[in-house]
Amino acid sequence: MTYIVKFRDDALKEWLKLDKSIQQQFAKKLKKCSENPHIPSAKLRGLKDCYKIKLRASGFRLVYQVIDDMLIIAVVAVGKREHSNVYNLASERMR
């Protein structure tokens, strides 16, 4: 089954601020995740059903939540890993 990718409004604003090359890298990885979004090594502790996509070279992270009953990958936050900013943002938005 293929999951549909949807963005939270605030995550979409962050996405649109990204350089096009970063967006393309994330889009490629999101497409791959849409087939199987449950990647054990990418699971985030403390955030229910949340996973990350890493772009190691640029230091960007994308946090998404899997909603299985609706077949949706909801992008929660996009940003730099520095000081765990993107993870803290995702945690706040999941409350």
Where do the protein language model's features map onto the residues?
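N-terminal first-folded block
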Residues: 7-39
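Generic N-terminal leader/processing signal
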Residues: 4, 27, 41, 50-52, ...
